[in-house]
């Protein structure tokens, strides 16, 4: 059975760069929300000798993640998941989108793929320093003084 590596946020950036480091004996599935970006990335990988496929997936939607899991398992045994999908304020992400994609999306990907992955398989969640450098619109600074009062 073929070994499958799923990379979320694979249409560009860290996801696509990570795909280029994977062994060429794996089937690579790049996911993201924009098929045109995924198709360009897939063409780039195929030129490098990879067997690669594109699948749109919104990681903030559990049903979309379940569809991705079904697609991935139809191609072989999922051995690796690189979860690099994410947004930041610099990408014009709203607080709601940041929470849905970066937090809930991570949980959905981990939970759904863990159901089908065997021992020895690996899920890697890629993050950024955004967890440590929160944008001002997320931090309720005006509420801090209220916390010191009765």
Where are these regions (language model features)?
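A hydrophobic alpha-helix adjacent to the NAD(P)-binding/active-site core of NAD(P)-dependent oxidoreductases
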Residues: 98-99
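Catalytic loop of short-chain dehydrogenase/reductase
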Residues: 87-92, 122-150
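Conserved Rossmann-fold cofactor-binding substructure of NAD(P)-dependent oxidoreductases
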Residues: 60-75
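Conserved glycine-rich Rossmann-like NAD(P)H-binding loop of the short-chain dehydrogenase/reductase
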Residues: 25-40
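Hydrophobic positions on the long internal alpha-helix
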Residues: 68, 82, 109-113, 117
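Conserved glycine-rich cofactor-binding loop
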Residues: 9-12
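Rossmann-fold cofactor-recognition segment
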Residues: 47-63
């Amino acid at each position: 059975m073929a070994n499958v590596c799923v990379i979320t946020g694979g249409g560009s950036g860290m996801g696509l760069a990570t795909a280029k480091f994977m062994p060429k004996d794996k089937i690579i599935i790049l996911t993201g929300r924009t098929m045109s970006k995924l198709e360009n990335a897939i063409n780039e990988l195929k030129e490098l000798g990879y067997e690669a496929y594109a699948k749109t997936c919104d990681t903030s939607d559990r049903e979309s993640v379940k569809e991705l899991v079904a697609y991935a398992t139809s191609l072989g045994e999922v051995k690796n998941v690189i979860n690099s999908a994410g947004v930041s304020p610099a990408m014009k992400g709203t607080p709601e989108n940041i929470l849905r994609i970066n937090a809930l999306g991570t949980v959905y990907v981990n939970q759904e793929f863990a159901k089908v992955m065997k021992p020895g398989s690996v899920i890697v969640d890629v993050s950024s320093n955004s967890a440590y450098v929160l944008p001002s619109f997320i931090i309720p600074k005006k509420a801090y003084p209220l916390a010191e009062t009765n």
